[in-house]
């Protein structure tokens, strides 16, 4: 079970598994025939407001720590989507979370935060299972 992260314009590799675009916006002017992802879940991208803030569209760019806090907070409304992805990975599907070609630093990209949220969800599920087993 693996969760990888990439930009959407990085070459496809045989072990990418399910390639999931997690951007709020679809890449502009990209023909459908040139799409490099299997599914697009825009709800897992930053909100329009958060996207504008991190890129400084309405003033100075938002500091990373503030972006991280707000993105994680926003994703609490996407718990079901995160649980679905955690289940896919837990059952052996490799998942590649894909973001904008402009997002060159994975350490400062929401796709890495999302990977952490999925991994945390998997850990909680494993903990719940262990607790149930120890009760018997």
Label every PLM stretch briefly.
Residues 1-136:
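Residues lining hydrophobic/aromatic ligand-binding pockets adjacent to catalytic sites
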């Amino acid at each position: 079970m693996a969760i990888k992260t990439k930009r959407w314009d990085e070459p496809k590799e045989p072990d990418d598994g399910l390639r999931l675009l997690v951007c709020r916006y679809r890449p502009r002017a990209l023909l459908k025939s040139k799409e490099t992802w299997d599914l697009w879940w825009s709800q897992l991208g930053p909100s329009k407001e958060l996207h504008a803030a991190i890129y400084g569209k309405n003033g100075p760019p938002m500091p990373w720590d503030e972006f991280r806090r707000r993105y994680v907070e926003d994703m609490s409304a996407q718990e079901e989507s995160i649980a679905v992805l955690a289940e896919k990975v837990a059952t052996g599907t490799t998942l590649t979370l894909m973001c904008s070609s402009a997002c060159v630093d994975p350490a400062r990209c929401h796709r890495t935060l999302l990977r952490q949220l999925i991994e945390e969800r998997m850990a909680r599920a494993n903990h719940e299972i262990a607790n149930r087993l120890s009760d018997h």
